Amino acid sequence: MSKAPLIAIVEDDEFFRQSMRRLMRSLGYTTEAFASAADFLASRRFDETACLIADIQMPGMTGIELYARLIEAGHEIPTILVTAYPDEAIRTRALTDGIACYLLKPFDDNDLMDCVRKTVEGGKPPAGNS
């Protein structure tokens, strides 16, 4: 029996972190949740992570900075960014830099589920969700 793909969630807001974790588990994924980018980096779970969901605005290191650091270190983890602070310039840059999906909080669970499924399956996320 194959192991369920690991979805890593990096979110400083505990409510959103736990909500996303429950949603991913309900879809059959293995999850690890981290309160900060530093916590995720310290975990060293890069190679087993099938998809990373990261908040953009976090203390210490943003989700965009986390993604850039992972890429620089050779860890190309498909990444979904979430934010409560929409910024078209950041969205455009993130998608140009390879972010798989960009979602605004509060987002519909179905939008996140679609992004994760497409990312884990190796397909392109639906255009409306990025």
Each model region followed by its residue ranges:
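Conserved acidic carboxylate
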Residues: 11
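Two-component/phosphorelay signaling modules centered on CheY-like receiver
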Residues: 14-32
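Acidic, metal-coordinating helix/loop segments flanking the phosphotransfer/catalytic sites
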Residues: 33-51
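Acidic catalytic/metal-coordinating carboxylates
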Residues: 35-36, 62-65
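Receiver (REC) domain active-site loop signature in two-component systems and cognate sites
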Residues: 58
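Alpha4 helix (beta4-alpha4-beta5 surface) of REC/receiver domains from two-component response regulators
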Residues: 65, 86-101
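C-terminal output helix
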Residues: 89, 107-116
